[in-house]
Structures are given as structure tokens and as C-alpha cells.
């Protein structure tokens, strides 16, 4: 057993400090330290005693032979198992370790012991982390309408039930309030949930270096006077239609209004110098103002314009609204805290654009990725010159980047995050929620100073890291809010995330339910999670219930809008059930890999069951590439025409876009102007040059040479052009074209020869057929032969031969006989001493004194025997007459 951790006494002593002086933590011990010391001594003594026991082997077997030692071991073993069983039972583990067999279940006992140790040590680690503050005990946050299960209270457990009721009543917090009047009803401008792109709400641009586009500055004033026909449509849709009518540039409409200012923004030199951290004022001494009127908002804006920096944070609610609502805005300066009721001042918040877009004032945010989009969506507010402490924490490589960690690290303040998911639409706000919102910005300016100082010290007096943080914060300020747009394929994105396979009916139901949920959420201004959560929608699509009660059975708890419109949903399910039941992988574009069919295996020569190089990763089959390869078409959910078999039309074979072995032809150049991608590909192809081309002028991208330098004798170009004449470009082109033309003629001649050989082979008659035809012709001649006719035929043949023109005979040459009197007859003698010829004579015998008698006999015997076959027919039938020795 390992000794306890060194931080355990510190934690237990801290817990003992909360107890009263007269109360003991454990019986017999005044505090936790004394108990830890006693337990540690006992553990050390037990460890030493266990080391003195006989070791397993011959020594243990010898002692085991004595009955007294055997009885002692069994007694102590039972005591240990009983203690272990109690400890395991206390921690909720399986505690039947003592009741098992001693021989057959030894491994099971060991497994139980290992599992129990893991559970106990994990629980000890969690409790130590909670005591040291690393991991706080998070209280559950549940909706207000959720009914907590109640225990049946009787006379025997009434006290326990009352105690549990008191303890559990403090653990639940509100996620959303049930009986709140919707703040959307009080807004002066109706919320735009239409399925159109988001248009910026800004119509006045303070601190502008580039004026606001005319399409945005005049849109609010044009609608009531100049466009009365658009009064019955949503404002955003009316603006969008008007822009399409007047053909105004969409780039100006949807561009970031402060993009020019942000691109040309540079932080001041003062914020890049070494800072002097200014300690925050105690929260009890800092005044806090709740802004809920227009006059107070204007006064706040004037105060902010006189500050050098201020901190900003937002509280957002997204459960009971389609696009979400910004319910609260907190602003803190060095001396004051402000909380703005943005639900009440929603239409007047544009006033703060004057201070938020001032490039001379630093705005400090923490995790502003969502805050920037919320400010644009609800108020038309934009931020210039922002410092994001979240990006600074990432650059400093801190352990965690949350605001809770920064408060604990720099300010030693423990923040309570139990109201993070609270319903911020509640009015009036409780004091606890106001205090939570105020803490988010009260300490942020001091954290901003401390982080700047730390980055300055890490940069060795150089503001490199500070500039990186401002650059990242500027990129966040350039973000734009994008409204969710519904399309016919929107459901596929959610369907692919679920990793479930649906057939055609289920997929159709999923598509119809997704469209119904989107339409209902936009109309009722509710979120997707409130109308119909994703898991419930997928469950209904999988089950396809036949009755409305089945739809309700798939939802627990049942959303209110589902219960109200259950009949409409039932009609959608019936419509989906009428679809033909087919596989949905091809329709939905979900690729599913599988083995090749048997027909493809037979046709494909290169197929191997374990050869992965020929199997594409997306599961499409491979077909032989001898013919033309089909091209994959664009997938569609409901095709108008019935497509052919997938195996024959959707073969994906990768082909090189750029290759070294293709020369650009004249036909490709005549097709038309090249796109940007084609030009890039052409440039890459031109870069693949033959290494021997370096001595020839390049065909393209020539270096600019002045014409005067070519005719100036003092220049190097003139000298090179006169001394070394290189091949001209046109000559190279002509040679290439000649080679191509010759190759084309050769291929055409080869093809023609192949066709001629093929035709001759088809018309050729085999040898057997020729013999049969000759025999048949001979039989016919014999049958029809007559002596008179034969004589006539012979005479005709003689006449034909005589009529043939004879070739002219060559002139006769004069014959001169050879004079043998002048010849040397000694050359024919065997032993004559004539001149030795320089040429080798194979028939010439070498003179030798001793002659080999055996070789002579062998030659005579071989010469006397005949190796020929006898002529005539044999009397022994079909047997051959082989020569005998």
C-alpha cells in the first residue's frame, strides 16, 4: 500500500478548520493531522511485518506443513478479506470477495480487488481536486419546468426526506423562465427571420475614413416613401428585392462597413510600451449603474468617449429565439461599472457606435468571437481597436484560457459560473445575476494590464507579442454575422453527422421534418432545440409511426409545438411512408464501401482480394480501362431521369491534370481563353523543361531585351548573337510538327497493315480445306473425262504454250578453253612439298609418325555399316524396319 500524498494533510487540515473547537473530526483524534500521522505509522508497520513473512516457495511450503501456522494463516486471511469487503461495500463496489471459492475463483478475486482500487483512487483524486480548487463541484442547472422525482414519504423515512428536500432545493438553477412575457413583442422593429441573407443594420457610420455605401445609408428612409408596394413584406426582403431591382452592387451591401478602417488600423505607441498595472478598485467601493433609458445611454456614451480604455461583455439568450437575443451588456471603466438593459434600449444602441469604433480607445473583450456577431445582429454595432484577453492567454500558453482561470490567476478571485446558462430575459434581474454580470468586466482592465506586462517581459522589451494579439483581435473584429439559410440539401449536413443509415422512406421523413422545423422556428421565433431537438427528429424518422400517438411516444418530454401541430407532422410521416422503399446511399450521397460484384471481378484482370492499390477509398468499383472511362455525374436526391446502373456510369479513375508526356497541340490553343486554373496548369507544364534545353532559347517567358542592345557592338548580346547562332523557335516548331506528322503517318500505316492482315486471315483457306477441294476437283475430272475431250484439251494447252512470246536469248560469248599445260600437277599429290597455304584446310591430314590403330578400326567398322532404311513395303505390317547392329 502506497503512502498517502503529501497534500492530503493540508487538505484535511483545511477541512478541520471549518469545524468548531470542541468537535472532533474522527473519534479519538483532535484534528486530521494527528489521524494522518497515526494511519501512516500503522501502514509502515504493516508493510514491514508483511516483508518478514515466509516467501512463496520452499520456505512457505515448509512452514505450511505445521498445523498451527496453517490455522493462523487462514484466520488472518479471513480477517483481511472481511476488512476488504467492508471497505469495498462502503465505496459502492462489489463486496462478495469473501464468499467465493479459494482455488477456482482466485483470478476473479484479484480482478475485484483491482477494480475496487481503481474506483477508490479515482474518487480520492476527484475529492483532492475539489478541495484544492482545481475542479469545483458543479451544481446541476436544470429547467424550471422539470419535475424532480419525489421519494415516497412514510413514517420511517420522514426525517430523511425532509433533510434531502432542504439539501436538494439549493442545487437547481433556472435554465429558462416559464412565465416570462416575450421581449420580442415590445421591440419597435420586427425581428427578421426570413430565409434571406443578413443585411447590416447600420445606417450612420461614425469615425469613418471611408463613407458608408449608399445602399445602407438610404435603405431605412426609402422604404416608407419610395416603395409603398413593399410594406407588406419583411424589411430585409424588401431591401433585398429593391437592390435586385435597381441592380446595385451586392458587394457594397454585404461587405463589412468598417473593413477599410480595420485594415488600416495600427495600435498607438502608448499601448505598445511597457505598462504600469493599475489595480482595480474594490467592488464594494465601485459604483454600479443600471442603464435602462435613452438619456442614461447618451450620458454613458459621453463618459466612454473620455476614457482611454474600457471593458465590454455580453449576456445572450438563444433558447427561446431563432437567431438569439442579446439581453444584457456590461461595460466597466477604471472607476465605474455599467449594466445596460439591451432589451429595453434595443433600437437606440446604435449610439454606442461612436465610442466602440473610436480607434483611440481600447476596447477589452474576453472571447469576442460570438460577441462581435451578436453586436452586429441585434444593434448594428461594430468594434475598432479591440484587445481580446482570450487570444492573449493563448499566446502566453497558459494552462487554461477561460475568464474564470484568469480571475483566479491574476486577481485571486473565485467566480461563480452557475448563472452562465441562466435566463437573462428575466426582469427585474435578481441581485445574484447582477453581481455575476458585473464581475465579468470589473477585473478585466487589470487583467489587461497584467497580460500586457507579461508579454512585454517575455518579448525582452519588444512589443512583438502585443502586436500579434492586436492583429488577431483585428481579425475577430472583421467577422460578419451570417444568417442561417435553408436549402433543399440543408438536412444532409445534419444527417451525415448522425452516422446512421436510413432508407428512402426514413430519409424523406427526415427531410420533411427538417423543413417543417425550420419553417415553424422562423415563424414562431423559436430555436430548433425548442421546436424539435435533433435526437427526437431522428427518432421519429427512424420509427415512422403510423399514428399521432407514436410521434408523441418518440418525444420525452414532448415539445409544446409538437403537441400543437401533431396532425401536420402525422401527414408528413404518411407522405414519407408512401415513398418506394429503396436504398438511400446513392440518393443521399452517402458513400458505402463494399466488395466488387462477381461480374466485375471476372472482367477486371488486375483485381485482387487483398490488393488495396486498385480499390478507391470512396468505395466505387473499378472497371477495365480498355475503353473510354465514364465520368461521374452530379449526384441528386430525386433525379428526373432514371439513371443507368451505377457500376457502369460512376467509375472514378484518377488522371493526371499535369503531365510531362503531352505536348500542347494546336487544337487546345484554339478552344478559347484559358481560365485562371488552366493558366496555372500551363505555367507548371512549361516549367518542366528538358535539361538540355538550357542551351536553347526558351519558347516563352523570355527575358526583356532592348532592341538597341542587339545592334550595339559593345554589348554582350551583340557578341553572343554574332558568334553563336542558336536554333530559331520556328525551326523547333517545324521539327516538332514534322515528327508528329511522321508519327501519325506511321501509326496510320500500321493500322492499315493490321486491317489488311486481319481481312486476309479471315479470307484465307486452311490446308485441310485446300486438300478436300483438290480431291473433289480430281473426282469430278475423272467422272467427266473422255478420250476425245482430253485430246482436245491437250491440243489447246499446246496452242497456248506456242502462242506465248519467247524471251529474247542473250548473245553467246566466245568460249576460250583452259590451258592445262601451265598448271602445277604437284598440288594434287598428297606428299608433295608445295607451298604451305595460309588458309586453313579442314580436309588436310597432319603427318604423324605413329598411327592410332584403334581409331582406324573404329572408322572402318563405322564405314562398313549401313545406316539407310530398306526400300519397299515391309512384310511385318505397320511396324518400322529399324537398322540392326
Curated annotation (Swiss-Prot):
Enzyme class, first EC level, given as a word: hydrolase
Mutation effect (residue 710 to R): No effect on sumoylation by USP36
Record EC number: 3.1.13.-
Gene expressing this chain: EXOSC10
Keywords for the protein's UniProt record, in alphabetical order: Cytoplasm, DNA damage, DNA repair, Exonuclease, Exosome, Hydrolase, Isopeptide bond, Magnesium, Metal-binding, Nonsense-mediated mRNA decay, Nuclease, Nucleus, Phosphoprotein, RNA-binding, rRNA processing, Ubl conjugation
InterPro entries with a match to the protein in the record: 3'-5'_exonuclease_dom, Exosome-assoc_fac_Rrp6_N, HRDC-like_sf, HRDC_dom, HRDC_dom_sf, RNaseH-like_sf, RNaseH_sf, Rrp6-like
Protein name: Exosome complex component 10
Gene Ontology cellular component annotations, sorted alphabetically: cytoplasm; cytoplasmic exosome (RNase complex); cytosol; euchromatin; exosome (RNase complex); membrane; nuclear exosome (RNase complex); nucleolar exosome (RNase complex)
